[in-house]
Design a protein with these regions (language model features):
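Interface amphipathic segments
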Residues: 1-389
């Protein structure tokens, strides 16, 4: 027995009852609903063409308005919706369960950005706070372990707060810790009505590697996002690039600031012991500043080894057009070419020697015009197919 028009509010009252400060909607008494049905993809596909749900998907539950009771279970072998595929999904929620309120498990979750396997999430309510515990594996090889503890609550101003307790994850063979000192600073405070977000200091630590992030967003008018890196290894976060292995230790800052219509993105970074394909190039310094835009930047880059600059480049990068444009002046002094030999693959190899000179790079970023002169010293290369060296 239930009023169809009041069913959403009855369900919301049952879920909201776990919060002590929840103000329920007024609904008619003695409303309840028991349901148990099987979902057929043919029906779903008519209304949502981009959604696939396995025909063996079952949904079962119970709602009781007078008892503020809400129970729901969902089991599905496979759901594919909007580019995300979930296999062996099991979802349980019971707002009267004293051990946990929600349980979610899945064998696999595939997205365009990252794949997850063996997902297990539990949720429980305590006073006005929802606590979550989530364990899963990530990555294509399923060798990246995540152990996350986080919470959701409201502060004294009525704003939502999403925060992390001490958590850890393994990414690219590095064990990272979130909120390692348990100071309760790693959290996001937000208000969806005003579209305001405040990021308290987020801290990621892995040995000597440290990443700190703070910021705030106020609608579309103000953005302040600040990231600091301390001794972060490039190989701990960079994806694999064919024939190009980059190593080094990153330190510096990356800032994005937008206030009163003025854009001021800026980066000041240093990569110590910068290596390309296991050849040490020295220390790389990179300074980038937005020209009142987040699409056009002035750039200054150089590599220094033993107080000598082997390469320096300065100019502008413009991403405002459909095809990005570059305008750079480049200087080389005894720049070693050996590191780029793997780029030739089977066509050419044994690239060697040094290059010195000046030239410009102007035009489309993907294929710029080069103008200048280079002097090669002790240079050479090999064409394996022709047996010419």
């Amino acid at each position: 027995k239930f009023s169809f028009s009041e069913l959403p509010r009855v369900a919301q009252n049952a879920l909201g009852s776990i919060y002590t400060n929840y103000k329920p909607y007024k609904v008619e008494p003695k409303q309840y609903l028991d349901f148990n049905f099987t979902v057929y993809n043919q029906i779903i596909n008519v209304f949502f063409p981009k959604v696939f749900i396995d025909d063996k998907t079952k949904i079962k539950g119970k709602i009781n308005a007078d008892k503020d009771l809400f129970r729901l279970s969902l089991n599905s072998p496979r759901i594919d919706a909007f580019g995300t595929e979930v296999k062996a999904l099991s979802f349980r929620t019971d707002n009267k369960n004293k051990l946990y309120n929600t349980s979610l498990t899945a064998d696999e979750v595939k997205t365009a950005y990252y794949n997850i396997s063996k997902l297990n999430l539990l949720n429980r309510a305590e006073n006005d706070t929802l606590y979550f515990k989530s364990i899963f594996k990530g990555g294509n090889k399923k060798n990246e372990d995540f152990n996350l503890d986080f919470f959701y609550t409201f502060n004294s101003d009525g704003k939502s707060v999403l925060g992390f307790e001490k958590s850890s994850f393994i990414f690219k063979e590095n064990n990272w810790n979130i909120n390692p000192d348990m100071k309760n600073t790693d959290k996001i405070t937000f208000d969806l009505k005003t579209n305001e977000f405040n990021f308290s200091q987020f801290k990621l630590i892995s040995g000597e590697q440290k990443i700190k992030f703070i910021g705030n967003l106020k609608g579309t008018e103000e953005k302040v996002l600040l990231v600091d890196f301390t001794k972060v290894k490039l190989q701990s976060f960079l994806p694999k690039i064919d024939s190009l292995a980059l190593k080094g230790v990153l330190s510096g800052s990356l800032d994005f600031v937008q206030k009163e219509g003025v854009y001021a993105p800026e980066a000041s970074l240093k990569i110590a012991n910068f290596e390309v394909n296991n050849f040490n190039q020295g220390d790389l310094f990179l300074n980038i500043k937005g020209e009142n835009s987040y699409k056009k930047y002035s750039t200054d880059l150089f590599i220094e080894s033993k107080d000598v600059k082997s390469i320096a480049a300065s100019g502008t990068l413009d991403f405002s057009a459909e095809r990005p444009i570059m305008d750079l002046e480049v200087f080389l002094e005894d720049f070693k070419l050996n590191a780029f030999s793997p780029l030739g693959k089977n066509v050419l190899s044994s690239l060697r020697g040094t290059a010195s000179g000046n030239f410009t790079l102007r035009g489309f970023l993907s294929n710029p015009d080069m103008d200048g002169a280079l002097r090669l010293n002790n240079a050479g290369l090999k064409f394996p197919y022709l047996n010419i060296n």
